[in-house]
UniProtKB/Swiss-Prot annotation:
Identification of the protein by name: Required for respiratory growth protein 9, mitochondrial
Species in which this protein is naturally found: Pyrenophora teres f. teres (strain 0-1)
Biased composition (Basic and acidic residues): 44-53
Record localization: Mitochondrion
Keyword Iron-sulfur: no
Amino acid sequence: MSCHNCSRTALGLFIRSLTNLQPTFAARRPLIHPQPLRFLSDARRPRKVESVSRPDGVNPDTEIEDTLSGEGFPNKRERPAWAIQKEALKEKLGGEAWNPRKKLSPDTMEGIRHLNSTQPDKFTTPVLAEHFKVSPEAIRRILKSNWKPSDKEYEERMERWNKRGERIWSNLVEMGVKPPKRWRDMGVGRARDGNVPRWKSTERNLVDVKDSASSDFTNYIPDEDIIPTVGKDGKSKPITSSIPLSERL
């Protein structure tokens, strides 16, 4: 009986020893900061450039003094004249688009480009602006533009130009202003039902039509030596202002 108990005790101790196994090696703790993998690659890591703090009260546009020569040179290059004029015009217009009161016809603008391209020293921007009674900014924009319309675009452009002239002269006819022959042939100002046109009545010329140019061109006389007036035969002819009044009567 004692042998049976001894065997049971020995068997129990053996089973208990199997169930309460202690690990031989200590458990590995997880890494708090895992190390990046090292491998070969052609790509270079971007280096972090530390920004240099600028002292207080220093303007980046101020001159930088050369440490070797002791001379100062501008940090920012000088702006061209056209950029200064563009900024001044933008401030003058108050952010609105460029929309001059006086607009030149497409043929006139093409003639301005032709004059400047053939003789740029003679037909400068101030000379063209004075002759065509527009601002130098308008001449500069015309000369800067290199856009050329196609045949279809040219026809549509001329059609819009004719409609614009017809609308303007129709409004002037209502004010008693006589339209030019070109617009009269197109039917502008034509009376209906046998009535007399408004520009032929006693209410004619009640509105003083002035040019949209500035007052600087009030006493303007075209210079025939710069741009001569040519007649139908292709020969130069004197302007009316150069002919004495006694010869014109």
